[in-house]
Structures are given as C-alpha cells and as structure tokens.
C-alpha cells in the first residue's frame, strides 16, 4: 500500500480507466476502441476462457488492431515504399508542398 494513495484521495480510478474502456471515463468521453472492446467483452462474457479464445477471436483481433494499429502501420509503410519506388523510377512527382517547396504560410 502506498504511503499516500492519491487516486483514492481524489476519487479517481485510473486503473479501471486503463483496463476497461467501456467503464466510466473521465469527462464522459468514450475511448478510441470502446466499441471493439465492448463487442469482445459481450461475446466472451459467461462462456469461459477456452471457448472465448475460439469463438470470439474475430472480436478480439479487431480490438487488438484498434489498440496497436499494427496492420494499419504496416500498410502505410508499404504505401510509402511504393511511393518512394515510383519517385525513384520517375513515374510519380509529389506535389511541391509535400517536399517542402510550397508557398510559405504566414
């Protein structure tokens, strides 16, 4: 037990906010992946861990992708590599404002 329990003193429950986005949030703002987490929890509730691993895999994978965005970042990297390849071959010229030669803004 910490010497000064600041969370309890101020009536905060940061641990719950970080672990379950579906729980009550500060300022009543839903988390980014709230919908995916809610679907996963509703699917897995009451069926047990072993069955939930198999039956709720799609919901869990969607939730993890929303949190970590691994597929999105991989796709952005692939697009960037393709763009660089096209620039190198001379088939694509980026607009001037993308390469820092645009008009200066006030």
UniProtKB/Swiss-Prot annotation:
PROSITE patterns xrefs: CHCH (PS51808)
Molecular functions per Gene Ontology: NADH dehydrogenase (ubiquinone) activity
Region span, Disordered: 84-106
CHCH domain ranges (all copies): 30-74
Motif (Cx9C motif 2): 56-66
Subcellular localization, as worded in the UniProt entry: Mitochondrion inner membrane; Mitochondrion intermembrane space
Membrane topology: Peripheral membrane protein
First-listed, main subcellular location of the protein, grouped into a coarse class: mitochondrion
Keywords: Disulfide bond, Electron transport, Membrane, Mitochondrion, Mitochondrion inner membrane, Respiratory chain, Transport
InterPro entries documented for this protein: NADH_UbQ_OxRdtase_FeS-su5
GO annotation, biological process: aerobic respiration; mitochondrial electron transport, NADH to ubiquinone; mitochondrial respiratory chain complex I assembly; proton motive force-driven mitochondrial ATP synthesis
Listed CDD domains: NDUFS5-like (cd24141)
GO cellular component, one term: mitochondrial inner membrane
Cysteines joined through disulfide linkages: 33-66, 43-56
UniProt cross-references to Pfam families, sorted A to Z: Ndufs5 (PF10200)
Domain of life: Eukaryota
Residue positions of motif Cx9C motif 1: 33-43
Family: Belongs to the complex I NDUFS5 subunit family.
Xref: PANTHER family: NADH DEHYDROGENASE [UBIQUINONE] IRON-SULFUR PROTEIN 5 (PTHR15224:SF1)
Domain writeup: Contains two C-X9-C motifs that are predicted to form a helix-coil-helix structure, permitting the formation of intramolecular disulfide bonds.
Quaternary state and interactors: Mammalian complex I is composed of 45 different subunits. This is a component of the iron-sulfur (IP) fragment of the enzyme.
Free-text function comment from the UniProt entry: Accessory subunit of the mitochondrial membrane respiratory chain NADH dehydrogenase (Complex I), that is believed not to be involved in catalysis. Complex I functions in the transfer of electrons from NADH to the respiratory chain. The immediate electron acceptor for the enzyme is believed to be ubiquinone.
Protein name, UniProt field: NADH dehydrogenase [ubiquinone] iron-sulfur protein 5
Organism: Homo sapiens (Human)
Lineage of origin: Eukaryota, Metazoa, Chordata, Craniata, Vertebrata
Protein encoded by which gene: NDUFS5
């Amino acid at each position: 037990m910490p010497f000064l329990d600041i969370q309890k003193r101020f009536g905060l429950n940061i641990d719950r906010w970080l672990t379950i986005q579906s729980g009550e949030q500060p300022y009543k703002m839903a988390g980014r992946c709230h919908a995916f987490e809610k679907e996963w929890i509703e699917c897995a509730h009451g069926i047990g861990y072993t069955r939930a691993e198999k039956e709720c895999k799609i919901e869990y994978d969607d939730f993890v992708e929303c949190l970590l965005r691994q597929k999105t970042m991989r796709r952005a990297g692939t697009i960037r590599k393709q763009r660089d390849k096209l620039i190198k071959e001379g088939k694509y010229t980026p607009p001037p404002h993308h390469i820092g030669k645009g008009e200066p803004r006030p």
